[in-house]
Each structure stands twice: as C-alpha cells, then as structure tokens.
Amino acid sequence: MKNDINATHYENIPTFADGGKDKYAIHVIIETPRDIRNKYRFDEENGIFKLGSVIAEGLTWPYDYGFIPQALGDDGDPLDVLFLADEPTFTGCLSDARLIGIIRLLKDGEENDRLLACPPRMKGVAQKTDDFDDIDDMPEDMMQSITTFLVQYSEEKKNKVEFKGVASRSKALKALETGHKSWKKKHKKR
C-alpha cells in the first residue's frame, strides 16, 4: 500500500510535454543532480526521494540523472534519462526537455539504456546544448565523459556492463513510446 505522504504525484505527470505538439518534447524528473557523489532514487512505496548510495571518491555525476514519468525501461524500472543542463537542478525537479538520443548499454546481460535530453531552448538565454537536435550534434568528448562515467559507475556497483553504442533521437523516441506503453499496461492492471 502506498503512503500518501508526497503531495507531488509523479505518476500523474505526462511523458510528453508541450501538449504533444512536438514529439521530442518530454518531461524529466531529476533524482540526482550533477557534480555530486550521492545517488538518489524515488521510492514509489513511500512517495519520497531516498538516498540510494554514494559513489566512490573521484567520481561525480556528470549531468543530472533522473527518469521520465509514465515510462518504463526493459528492466521494469522508470526509464532513465541524463539531463544535459549547464547547471545542476535539484532532486525532485520537474523540467521540460528535448529528447536527443539514447545510449545503449547491457547490464548483466539485459538492456539498460539511458535516454539523453537537453533543456528547452530559452529565448534570450544561451545554453551549451542549444545546437543539439540529435545525438550526433554532441561533441565527442562530452559523449565520451558520459559513457566512461556510466561504465565506471556500473562496474563500481559490481555489475557487468557493456557499452553497445548510441542511437538517434528517432530511436530514442521509439524506446520512449515502448516504455510509455509498458507503463500504461502495468498501471491498467492496478
């Protein structure tokens, strides 16, 4: 039984932002802000964010990390997303975002992909990601730092992880649509 201690009901936030006008406009919920060692996770049973672990000294989250509401990954957990904002947000932050691609990973033999999203373009405010429409627009060193971190983080957790490459935003959108269908199917049974 879920406790009603959280006034914010993340399950009621739609996957897609902008009323669906732009198929790549999505919502993201931040669990772990960038530049810290703590790993937070949303505890669905209690409706609150919880400290899940602390990563090794010398490693920090390179970008905000969270999930997409109303979407499940192949592992049955909320679909993971790296939010490539210039500055950190905070745990529990809801943001509109632009889907730009997907990092393909195998963790212990199972798909465990990470979507990549950027903040929306804001009139009068320049952001490093303004020119990113697809994953190919990302600088190679930025992608390398993300994939290196994900592999190191997984290995620290004693998971066998394999980097399988990256894919375009259209492939990321397909993964997101599949994840949204999985979420609807799971919640229809309740």
Locate predicted features.
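Hydrophobic N-terminal alpha-helices or hydrophobic patches in metabolic proteins across all domains
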Residues: M1-R190
